[in-house]
UniProtKB/Swiss-Prot annotation:
GO MF annotation list: ribosomal large subunit binding
GO cellular component term of the entry, any: cytosol
UniProt keyword Cytoplasm present: yes
The keyword Glycosyltransferase appears for this protein: no
Protein name: Ribosome-recycling factor
GO biological process: cytoplasmic translational termination
Amino acid sequence: MINEIKEDAKSRMAKCVEATKNQMAKVRTGRAHPSLLDSIKVPYYGTPTPLKQVGNVSIEDSRTLAITVFDTTMIAAVEKAIMSSDLGLNPMSAGTTIRIPLPALTEERRKDLIKVVRAEAENGRIAVRNVRRDANSDVKALEKEKECTEDDVRRTEDEIQKFTDAHIKQIDEILTAKEAELMEV
């Protein structure tokens, strides 16, 4: 039973780290990356559809994304969806391809993005600590039911704390890498 609690905590913490990594990937740096447009939904026959389902997103060069839309009647809708997103991008269409030049980030915008990234990292840390709290309370419940000893509880709590420290360290490493990426000119 204790092993199940530990494994569950470990997998949930790993999911928290992965979710934090995915949230940080959405933050725009100076470099073009297809995942930048993952959050954009395009109205397709009245249904909000992810951009990658209506077109192929690729990197043209380090500061330009290109979208090849599958259905040419969707070009205007894709452009409108990109412009109305909070990414601050200005698409240009050329035939069946939409090019999106990424403007260079200003120093002020970089600092704002670093604040956003730090907030995401803190949310990830909080999620990991919540998993730790849940796991520790599950172990204490086992002790109350006399299914394990006090020594088992202490040992398990120490192991769960080690998992927590390791996963928070991963989040901190992701944060450091993202901050360095944002500060690159």
